[in-house]
């Protein structure tokens, strides 16, 4: 029964993230169609009307970016609050019960993701990938089925997608450590989902508008990114479901390590130091209705309230 729940939750994560990631693709296609329609009717439409349509499109894009920026700041607050108020306290409790070292586990979780992040950054910077799509151009879903190897090659060659794929795996591992704690699982799941929504929206927008990738390649990359967290979650959950003394000890220490990894994710996003987020950043290009600290604090307050509700139970 637990295994079925793991598969259903992983499927939900995959489908939800994938569908949300397709929204910018649909939105941009719709805007392009609108521009083409305006250009075709340019002879019969006044310059004033054309300029008005262009201004409307620009306003829509600006509004879209503001919403992503607000959601991104809110997600940072959720991750920060979840790390400090829920995952780390529960991890310390589990770690002490299994005679683990609190400081070492936190440090391993934090530095583990940091080192992995740096290795990915160094690898892609040395490679200096240039997007020359000479190999296979995906024109339809049939091309995707016929060339599965090219899908992974595109992932590895795309610096931003590859870095976010690795980051998604670490999120899934953090989620998998909470399999045996339902209340904590729900809160961590919500925090990760809210964190992934602006990431996948920005990723799709980046691939379409800046990298000029073809539609089906964008869809493939979005699907791979969407699958990263479910993969990490399923692997750790399956290990967690085997109730052996060794696995109990490992899971007890892994929960605190996952707290360290979540702390790294929230900290780097909070201070703007996450290297692969620079290309995805939209906050620097838009003016938010309120200061960004307002949205971060709102995000922090939700795990704070939930932590008191859980402690009362």
From Swiss-Prot:
Functions in the homeostasis of manganese ions. The chain crosses the membrane at residues 3-23, 68-88, 104-124, 155-175, 184-204, 218-238, 252-272, 286-306. It comes from Saccharomyces cerevisiae (strain ATCC 204508 / S288c) (Baker's yeast). One of its GO terms (cellular component) is trans-Golgi network. It comes from the Eukaryota. This is Metal homeostasis factor ATX2. The keyword Acyltransferase does not apply. InterPro entries: ZIP, ZIP9.
């Amino acid at each position: 029964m637990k295994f079925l729940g793991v598969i259903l939750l992983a499927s939900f994560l995959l489908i939800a993230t994938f569908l949300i990631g397709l929204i910018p693709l649909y939105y941009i296609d719709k805007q392009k169609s609108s521009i083409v329609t305006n250009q075709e009717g340019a002879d019969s439409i006044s310059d004033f009307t054309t300029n008005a349509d262009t201004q409307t499109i620009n306003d829509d894009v600006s509004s879209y970016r503001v919403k992503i920026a607000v959601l991104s700041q809110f997600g940072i607050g959720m991750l920060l609050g979840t790390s400090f108020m829920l995952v780390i306290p529960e991890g310390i409790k589990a770690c002490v019960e299994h005679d683990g070292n609190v400081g070492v586990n936190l440090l391993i979780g934090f530095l583990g993701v940091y080192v992995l992040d740096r290795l990915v950054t160094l690898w892609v910077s040395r490679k200096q990938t240039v997007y020359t799509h000479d190999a296979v151009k995906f024109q339809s879903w049939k091309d995707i089925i016929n060339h599965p190897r090219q899908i992974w090659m595109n992932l590895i060659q795309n610096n931003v997608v590859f870095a976010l794929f690795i980051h998604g795996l670490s999120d899934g591992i953090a989620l998998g450590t909470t399999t045996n704690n339902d209340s904590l699982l729900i809160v961590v799941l919500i925090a990760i989902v809210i964190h992934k929504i602006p990431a996948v929206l920005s990723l799709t927008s980046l691939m379409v508008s800046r990298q000029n990738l073809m539609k089906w390649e964008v869809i493939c990359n979005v699907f791979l990114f969407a699958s990263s967290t479910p993969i990490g979650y399923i692997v750790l959950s399956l290990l967690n479901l085997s109730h052996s003394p060794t696995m109990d000890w490992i899971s007890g220490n892994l929960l605190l390590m996952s707290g360290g990894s979540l702390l790294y994710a929230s900290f780097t996003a909070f201070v703007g130091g996450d290297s692969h987020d620079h290309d995805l950043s939209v906050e620097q290009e838009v003016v938010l209705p309120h200061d960004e600290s307002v949205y971060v604090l709102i995000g922090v307050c939700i795990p704070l309230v939930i932590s008191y509700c859980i402690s009362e139970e």
